[in-house]
């Protein structure tokens, strides 16, 4: 089958194509024949099968039942191609009804004019919601209804829900999720019933989620190290496979716990809490952390919940008395039921493990037990009978505090009975503040001098002077109330703070002049007020996170305390108005997360406020500042300022001179943004300074050897792994006038050319041909004759632009002989033009009869006066008038021409041959030799290698 892409580059592929089932009415010659052994063994079964299905199958003799399986990702947009039934069933367009003939002879069936194929779903059902079928082409596409695998399969509980021609099927033991369709291929001639199965592949579009936001786990305090406890309510992820929950972790282990994950045979992962240290409930009874579930998608998605680990109590503590002995005084006239003392033991355990009962020791006499009643629950000792005259004055009460499974704690109470012959003073309170069961309730921050109660002091005997004072510590004062001498007012002396001390116990003591006194205990309970705002542990919360973080990445857990109690001390957390929208803060747990990927190059630092608000009325709040720094990752390649660079450099530029700066930047920071430059090609010629980006040439560059260079420069950053980019650099060499013209013809100062006396004025005689390796004006050449030698050398002139030498005047009898022209070839270079010279030898005669004579003349040093006249090149051609000569030379010339016509024709033939020979010499690749004349002119002989001048 063919793979098909989609708009999000998700593979949609038909993974299998089952062959058509065998039909008994098809041509047996084209069927696969089983082996003889198999056919003999299964012959009865095959025969029975023929008898049963043959009649039904023959009703549609050419039908074929076929099954196709495709797969695609969930969440694809509308119009994504799933598969082509016509292609995958190998059905040709406009095929005939006989499929065997169609497949074997398509050219024969195409001409029969059979009706075209058509495809249709067996019935409507749910197919229109998820897929569309093209009735002509047989192409299946996704519809506008987006396919959600979790909604299709997980909601079905692993079964199948059929609706017409479409159904959804899933297996609870696997990750398969199938969309089933029945497709009919018509017309009847090649009818097929096709079962199409579309496997819906899962993508990571769901984050793990815990069923509850707060999970509680109870661990006995005597649990040994490595104890494992399963955490109930594990996270649920509707995705399957690697996209499901893969692992768990704790945000804060407290050094006491860790997590392990176990996978059962069904692939379900359960987190286990493992005890890593010794626990003591009495030291710390609770640990709070954040449990995070993470799936295996890319990028992974996270879910979190608050994990509260409670330490359950065991009976590892016994009751304990703070004191070993107490001393109590009882007046002899005390009434029955008067409290004598209270014993109280402490057990640090909880619940039934801390249940304490009090009892007398067996050493306590029964008479004492009858006199003093001990409450076994509260430990209160009361006078149970009236004190008689014969009662002992001192009683020793040995009291036991009993705990479950413990040795009793022991305390001794020594009770001294004071015989009284008169009645003690009386203290009668009248409460102003709210009082319930002997406890006075005051609001904190009540103003100074807040009245609490009036106390009236009475002397039953009426004959003693009674004094009164306040016993105990606290911001209270007991002062006489002025209008009445025997009344006192209890009031506050300064504002009280619940958070400093919430409970006070004081006593009003009255005594008479005989030394007898009585106490009245006053208990004061402060009521908390919302007078404290939450306080962050740090006013500035500095955080860091690497860029390109996963979505919903954890940043920190905010924590603020409130000294108030109850709801007034419960703190909620909120983002400030200046916080970007992609930051989120859990109001209950204080967990701060970022929902999107951060890019350091877009923004490196974030600074915003967070609020901690209590639940008091009115609520109080405090503000902290979050300073988040995004750490850099090497996610940006170096970037050149220009796509490519071009530099113009004069030739002969000195080695290691500065050609130009290659500017490159890297948006990353630190080492990730450090860029090193290097030349990838021609590094033997060029080098680049990494620090400055300066490009230099190691050697001097000659334009005539190479006019331009193309370099590739690579920029590599210092990240791990390193990122790089390249750019193209073009270096164009600018020409300077460093090459004089090179004379190619004539090739030697010793060569000569025969000029016939019959040559007409204005006729070309020869030429000087030179080239210059420079360019532009440096290569524009001008020709001039700067020296002449011969009978009448001024008879010849040279074209300053072309170098053509022509005869100016008709040759006379006196002009016979050797004419020597010193030609200067100059360029137009700036600032100093360069030049070369060449000697042009012209021998005027009818024939060359003695070459040795001519060569001897050429070997003599000519005495030539140098003319310093510069050649003038004009755009328009110039013409010189040929001055009229005397009649005699003209007549002689005409006579010679008329008498020597044959000689003239012969001379012209020789001239033509010489011209062809010159062209041949120009094309020769031998060494070109320029031989200057010796003599007064300071010339030298130079040899040059042949130069290709085809472009001149």
Swiss-Prot record:
Predominant location category: membrane
PROSITE patterns reported for this sequence: CADHERIN_1, CADHERIN_2
Entry GO CC: plasma membrane
Keyword Calcium listed: yes
Transmembrane segments: 892-912
Cellular localisation: Cell membrane
Keywords attached to this entry: Calcium, Cell adhesion, Cell membrane, Glycoprotein, Membrane, Repeat, Signal, Transmembrane, Transmembrane helix
Domain of life, source organism: Eukaryota
Membrane-side (Extracellular) residue stretches: 61-891
GO molecular function, one term: calcium ion binding
SMART domains, sorted: CA
Signal peptide from the UniProt entry: 1-60
PANTHER family noted in UniProt: CADHERIN-87A, PROTOCADHERIN-20
The protein's name in its UniProt record: Protocadherin-20
């Amino acid at each position: 089958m063919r793979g098909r892409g989609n708009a999000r580059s998700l593979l949609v592929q038909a993974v299998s194509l089952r062959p058509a089932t065998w039909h008994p009415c098809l041509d047996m010659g084209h069927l696969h024949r089983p082996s003889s052994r198999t056919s003999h063994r299964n012959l009865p079964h095959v025969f029975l099968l023929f008898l049963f299905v043959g009649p039904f199958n023959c009703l549609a003799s050419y039908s074929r039942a076929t099954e196709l399986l495709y797969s695609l990702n969930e969440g694809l947009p509308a119009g994504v191609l799933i598969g082509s039934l016509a292609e995958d069933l190998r059905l040709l367009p406009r095929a005939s009804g006989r499929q065997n003939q169609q497949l074997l002879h398509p050219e024969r069936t195409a001409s029969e004019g059979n009706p075209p194929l058509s495809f249709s779903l067996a019935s409507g059902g749910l197919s229109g919601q998820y897929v569309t079928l093209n009735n002509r082409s047989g192409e299946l596409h996704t519809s506008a209804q987006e396919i959600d695998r979790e909604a299709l399969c997980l909601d079905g509980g692993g079964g199948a829900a059929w609706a017409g021609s479409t159904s959804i099927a899933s297996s609870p033991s696997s990750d398969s999720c199938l969309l089933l369709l029945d497709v009919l291929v018509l017309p009847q001639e090649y009818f097929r019933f096709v079962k199409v199965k579309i496997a819906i592949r899962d993508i990571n579009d769901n984050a793990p989620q815990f069923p509850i936001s707060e999970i509680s786990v109870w661990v006995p305090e005597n649990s040994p190290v490595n104890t494992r406890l399963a955490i109930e309510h594990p996270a649920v992820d509707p995705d399957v496979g690697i996209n499901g929950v893969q692992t768990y972790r704790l945000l804060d282990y407290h050094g006491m716990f860790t997590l392990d994950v176990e996978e059962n045979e069904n692939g379900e992962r359960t987190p286990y809490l493992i005890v890593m240290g010794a626990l003591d409930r009495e030291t710390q009874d609770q640990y709070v952390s954040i449990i995070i579930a993470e799936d295996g998608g890319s990028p992974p998605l996270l879910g979190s919940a608050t994990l509260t680990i409670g330490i359950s109590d065991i009976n590892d503590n016994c009751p304990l008395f703070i004191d070993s002995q107490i001393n109590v005084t009882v007046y002899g006239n005390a009434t029955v039921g008067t409290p004598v003392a209270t014993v109280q033991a402490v057990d640090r355990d909880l619940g039934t493990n801390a249940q304490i009962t009090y009892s007398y020791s067996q050493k306590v006499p029964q008479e004492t037990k009858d006199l003093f009643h001990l409450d076994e629950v509260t430990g209160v000792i009361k006078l149970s009978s009236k004190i008689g005259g014969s009662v002992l004055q001192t009683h020793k009460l040995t009291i036991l505090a009993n705990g479950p499974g413990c040795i009793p704690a022991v305390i001794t109470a020594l009770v001294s009975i004071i015989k009284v012959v008169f009645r003690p003073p009386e203290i009668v309170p009248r409460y102003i503040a709210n009082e319930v069961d002997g406890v006075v309730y005051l609001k904190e921050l009540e103003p100074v001098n807040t009245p609490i109660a009036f106390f009236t002091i009475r002397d039953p005997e009426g004959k003693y002077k009674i004094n009164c004072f306040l016993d105990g510590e606290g911001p209270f004062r007991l002062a006489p109330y002025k209008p009445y001498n025997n009344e006192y007012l209890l009031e506050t002396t300064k504002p009280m703070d619940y958070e400093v001390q919430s409970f006070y116990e004081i006593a009003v003591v009255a005594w008479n002049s005989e030394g007898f006194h009585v106490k009245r205990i006053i208990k004061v309970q402060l009521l908390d007020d919302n007078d404290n705002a939450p306080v962050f542990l740090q006013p500035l919360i500095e955080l860091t996170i690497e860029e390109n973080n996963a979505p919903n990445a954890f940043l920190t857990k905010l924590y603020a305390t409130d000294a108030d109690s109850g709801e007034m001390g419960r703190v909620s957390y909120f983002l400030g108005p200046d916080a970007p929208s992609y930051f989120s803060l859990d109001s209950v747990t204080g967990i701060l997360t970022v929902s999107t990927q951060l890019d350091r190059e877009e923004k490196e630092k974030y600074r915003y406020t967070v609020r901690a608000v209590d639940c008091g009325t009115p609520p109080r709040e405090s503000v902290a500042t979050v300073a988040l720094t995004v750490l850099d990752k090497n996610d940006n390649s170096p970037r050149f300022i220009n796509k490519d660079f071009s530099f113009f450099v004069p030739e002969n530029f000195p080695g290691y001179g500065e050609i130009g700066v290659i500017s490159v930047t890297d948006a990353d920071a630190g080492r990730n943004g450090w860029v090193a430059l290097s030349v990838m090609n021609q590094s033997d010629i060029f080098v680049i300074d990494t620090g400055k980006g300066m490009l230099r040439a190691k050697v001097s560059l000659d334009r005539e050897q190479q006019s331009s260079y193309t370099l590739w420069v690579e920029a590599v950053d210092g990240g791990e792994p390193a990122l790089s980019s390249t750019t193209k650099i073009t270096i164009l060499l600018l020409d300077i006038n460093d090459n004089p013209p090179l004379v190619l013809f004539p090739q030697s100062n010793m060569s000569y050319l025969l000029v016939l006396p019959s040559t007409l004025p204005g006729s070309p005689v020869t030429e000087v041909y030179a080239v210059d390796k420079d360019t532009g004006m440096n290569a524009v050449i001008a020709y001039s004759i700067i020296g002449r030698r011969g009978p009448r050398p001024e008879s010849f002139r040279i074209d300053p632009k072309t170098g053509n030498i022509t005869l100016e005047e008709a040759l006379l009898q006196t002009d016979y002989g050797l004419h020597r022209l010193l030609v200067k070839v100059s360029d137009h270079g700036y600032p100093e033009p360069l030049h070369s010279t060449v000697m042009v030898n012209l021998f005027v005669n009818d024939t060359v009869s003695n070459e040795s004579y001519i060569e001897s003349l050429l070997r003599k040093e000519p005495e030539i006066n140098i003319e310093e006249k510069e050649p003038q090149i004009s755009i328009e051609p110039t013409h010189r008038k040929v001055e009229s000569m005397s009649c005699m030379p003209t007549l002689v010339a005409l006579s010679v021409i008329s008498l020597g016509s044959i000689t003239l024709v012969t001379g012209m033939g020789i001239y033509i041959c010489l011209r062809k020979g010159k062209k041949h010499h120009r094309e020769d690749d031998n060494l070109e030799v320029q031989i200057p004349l010796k003599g007064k002119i300071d010339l030298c002989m130079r040899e040059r290698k042949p130069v290709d001048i085809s472009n001149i």
